[in-house]
Amino acid sequence: MEVLNICQVEELEMRGDSMTCKLVDKGSVNQVVQQQGEWVHLGSGEITIDSAADESCWPIDEGGAFEIRSSKRNILLKAANGQAMRHLGEKDVTFKDEMSGEVLGMTFQVTEVKKPLAAVWRLVEKGNLVQFGPSDAQCFIQNLQSGKRIQLHKRGGSYILKVEYVRWVPVFPGHA
């Protein structure tokens, strides 16, 4: 199974009934996962692409299937109005792009935001080009190494990535 990632998936690890997906901080995008199992659908959603965000942020009350872990960095997060926000840790979120069906992954800082926000500079840092244009066809994230594109959609004054949240569930051979 090939996994296309905004951030490369290094390792999938089960802890209890939740999955930990470790992401590599590199620009490459393709990774083959050598483990038997399947991606389980957790629901559909949207991630807003934010060109002004300092970090990719995730709402406190969303994505319970993805474990929150302590951040390795001490981050001071502020809302657009300058108000300080609590930083509760970070989580790796896996999802399928609605158009290609390919599995993607990103690390988000968990804080007091209303919706998931992907920081453009973080996407660029991972080796991607982020393009906004007047039509949906001109709005995408493109990995510079592979050339693969992820379609974005314009909604009002925002650009969004429509996704299906998924979690890797291993299947152990010989167990029914």
Locate each region found by the language model.
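Residue-level detector of intrinsically disordered, flexible termini
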Residues: 51, 78-79, 136, 175
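Generic N-terminal initiation segments characterized by hydrophobic and/or small/turn-forming residues
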Residues: 1, 9-11, 20, 63, ...
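Sterically constrained small-residue positions within well-ordered secondary structures
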Residues: 40, 68, 84-86, 97-99, ...
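C-terminal reverse transcriptase regions that engage the nucleic-acid substrate
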Residues: 75-89
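Aspartic protease core domain of the pepsin/retropepsin superfamily
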Residues: 56, 89-176
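Aspartyl protease active-site motif detector
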Residues: 32-77, 107-112, 116-119
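Generic structural hydrophobic/aromatic packing signal, biased to beta-strands
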Residues: 6, 21, 77, 93-95, ...
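Intrinsically disordered, low-complexity interaction arms of viral/retroelements
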Residues: 1-43, 51, 158-176
